[in-house]
């Protein structure tokens, strides 16, 4: 299949060099090139691709079960649209480590998400029931505890809640993803007294080399958040 980078860089497979007239490999990659097929210098296309890649890693590392991804996805390795590179012992299938410098932003983001996963045992189901009576997993499609599957919602929120391993406080994480091409507003669940929502991760935030991805912005007394187009926001209750 496609690498994660290629998933957002190619609409079609490009297996011509395999020698089968591009007839091999899966034809249903469900990919999107974000407006340009393959490599491009368009900053808008490249910016969107990076945001979607971050969204994918955020979803993976906020999911239950073992988190696995293809080697090189953490620095946007490419197979140039080839989704069946079994016969390519060359740059098509090799890991191009030079991309680590070009895509340091993605590499740093993946490191941040791995650390975030380690810090929140609820994402790994290493918790007891929460003391605040929130369910362990709940769905919030646009509004609190709205589990509707109506396609018009366009905005999904998933909240994890449990008692941490030391049994000292609740571990509450809210994952929110807007796949729509316009900004949308998410209504957040009201937290128990003394706790407030903090933004931990925003895949639309501007990146500065060496920045602290863990810096949080507190939402004092606010139970709504504007989610930019095609963006993931992760909040924690503190």
What positions do the PLM features span?
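Alpha-amylase-like alpha-glycosidases and glucanotransferases acting on alpha-linked glucans and related
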Residues: 1-46, 141
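Carbohydrate-interacting/catalytic domains
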Residues: 40-54, 59-69, 73-238
């Amino acid at each position: 299949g496609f690498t994660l980078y290629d998933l957002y860089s190619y609409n079609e497979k490009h297996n011509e060099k395999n020698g089968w007239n591009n007839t091999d490999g899966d034809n249903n990659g469900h990919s999107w090139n974000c407006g340009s097929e393959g490599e491009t210098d368009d900053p808008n296309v490249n910016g969107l691709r990076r945001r979607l890649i971050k969204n994918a890693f955020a979803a993976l590392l906020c999911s239950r079960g073992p988190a696995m991804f293809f080697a090189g996805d953490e620095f946007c390795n490419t197979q140039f649209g080839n989704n069946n590179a079994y016969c390519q012992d060359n740059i098509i299938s090799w890991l191009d480590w030079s991309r680590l410098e070009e895509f340091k932003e993605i590499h740093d983001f993946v490191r941040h998400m791995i650390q975030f996963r380690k810090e929140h045992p609820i994402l790994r189901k290493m918790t007891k029931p929460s003391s605040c009576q929130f369910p362990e997993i709940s769905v919030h499609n646009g509004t609190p505890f709205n589990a509707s599957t109506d396609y018009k919602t366009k905005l999904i929120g998933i909240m994890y809640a449990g008692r941490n391993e030391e049994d000292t406080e609740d571990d509450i994480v809210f994952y929110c993803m807007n796949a729509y091409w316009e900004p949308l507003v998410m209504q957040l669940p009201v937290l128990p007294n003394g706790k407030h929502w903090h933004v931990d991760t925003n895949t639309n935030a501007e990146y500065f080399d060496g920045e602290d991805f863990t810096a949080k912005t507190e939402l004092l007394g606010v139970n709504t958040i504007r989610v930019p187009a095609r963006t993931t926001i992760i909040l924690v209750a503190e």
